[in-house]
Amino acid sequence: MSDFIINRVQMFLAEANKASVEVSDDLIEEFANACKDAFKKQFTEERETKFRYRMSNVGKPLCQLQMEQSGAEAEAMPYNAKMRNLFGDLIEAAAIIIMKASGVEVKDIQKKVQYKFDDKYINGTMDVKIGDKIYDIKSASPYSFENKFGENGGFDALKNDDPFGYLAQGYMYGEGAKSDFGGWIVINKSTGEWCTTEVPPEDSSKQEVINKAKENIKNYIKELEYLI
């Protein structure tokens, strides 16, 4: 599936370099609305101040989650961090429209999902479903594009060095959506290149990663009960 996605996107963009291409008014309107929502998200929406575990953070090291939960003051972000976040949202919005326009079957965009275990649950918002698999869209620096997701990286490199918990995030999106997690669709935010990092068919790490994330949740809840 990942080769199909990249091939269709590359053909579409190559054709757009040579001449105008067909993009429906509905897709253009969808992109405009996504850009508007991205700007509101980064600048005008009320920020969530209370820490909560979610699919996008539960795979991080437990000590980091505990620091965030305790309210420890984080290092001040540089002023341009907000621009980086906005660029990421806009690239993701463009990626979805480009895939749709190139003939990739994109569905269930930004769908809320929930994973339940024991008497607990964790929420998240998956990016897209393509075919029968869930994919996460990432914008990446040139270094990360090459060395984490691209030719010099790949699934094994990401599995061995995953401080942001990308694997746990993706696996839980899949579990919550009751579909397999396919991997990552990645756009180099400097050059515009695309690549995919596919989860291998015989993936032995899934349950181990999910179990570690569940243990993080249990320890997080236990610490809250202790503080209360």
Language model features by range: what are they?
Residues 153-167:
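A short acidic, glycine-rich active-site loop
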Residues 1-133, 141-153:
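Metal-dependent nuclease catalytic cores that hydrolyze phosphodiester bonds in DNA/RNA
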Residues 100, 139, 175-178:
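Hydrophobic/aromatic-lined pockets within catalytic cores
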Residues 127, 136, 169:
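Acidic active-site catalytic centers that drive phospho-/nucleotidyl reactions
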Residues 136-139, 145-149, 184-186, 194-197:
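A short secondary-structure junction signal
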Residues 97, 168-175:
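A broadly conserved amphipathic alpha-helix scaffold signal in soluble, globular proteins
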Residues 121-122, 166-169:
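Amphipathic coiled-coil/heptad-repeat helices and related helical stalk/stem segments
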Residues 160-163, 175-228:
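Metal-dependent nuclease catalytic regions and adjoining charged, substrate-binding loops involved
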